[in-house]
From Swiss-Prot:
Belongs to the universal ribosomal protein uL22 family. The gene is RpL17. Residues 169-178 have a biased composition (Basic residues). This is Large ribosomal subunit protein uL22. Keywords: Ribonucleoprotein, Ribosomal protein. It holds the Pfam family Ribosomal_L22. GO terms for molecular function: structural constituent of ribosome. GO terms for biological process: cytoplasmic translation. Residues 157-185 are annotated as: Disordered. HAMAP family: Ribosomal_uL22_A (MF_01331_A).
Length: 185
């Protein structure tokens, strides 16, 4: 079992999944992972399916050199975006694996949220391409490691209404003394 970069706050209410040396572009996968961070599991799976179908876009914020501008990116408050199909498929499979782990642990799958997702660079894989005049250039790939931690969302407790438990207004010592005098009279 591999080591994770963070440990969940509540290990009994969370589950993990990871993939190592995945042959998918690091930069595209990092942007896709940032897009689904802190999403509910069901929403993230739906989002990734929409990315594969080009119905929703992945905003490119860090690795955005040469990335074209798209109208769909306005929903995320930026202008540049793409639909990295392979990255979305790899992340979707990883989320499915984490969902199976949660189901095995007996967690409520509908209340799961992506608490932590991280994409790291893996060692580059080397190939070669043949150029003019007998030269050879490197033809590298940039694989990545992905880890995800899902946690059960806490139940939201309704706040008490203001009529039931209204906080008393603070009074100055002078005003309290005046009220005591009035009560004595």
């Amino acid at each position: 079992m591999g080591r994770y970069s963070v440990e969940p706050d509540n290990a009994t209410k969370s589950c993990k999944a990871r993939g190592s040396n995945l042959r998918v572009h690091f930069k595209n996968t990092r942007e896709t992972a940032q897009a689904i961070k802190h999403m509910a599991l069901r929403r993230a799976q739906r989002y990734l399916k929409n990315v594969i179908a080009k119905k929703e876009i992945v905003p490119f914020r860090r690795f955005n050199g040469g990335v074209g501008r798209k109208a769909q990116a306005k929903a995320f408050g930026c202008t540049q975006g793409r639909w990295p199909k392979k990255s979305a498929e790899f992340l979707w499979q990883l989320l499915r694996n984490a969902e199976s782990n949660a189901d095995y642990k007996g967690l409520d799958v509908d209340r799961l949220v992506i608490d932590h997702i991280q994409v790291n660079r893996a060692p580059k894989m080397r190939r070669r391409t043949y150029r003019a005049h007998g030269r050879i250039n490197p033809y590298m790939s940039s694989p990545c490691h992905i880890e995800v931690i899902l946690s059960e969302k806490e139940q939201v407790v309704a706040a008490p209404s203001p009529e039931e438990d209204a906080p008393k207004k603070k009074q100055s010592k002078k005003k309290m003394a005046r009220q005591k005098l009035m009560q004595r009279d």
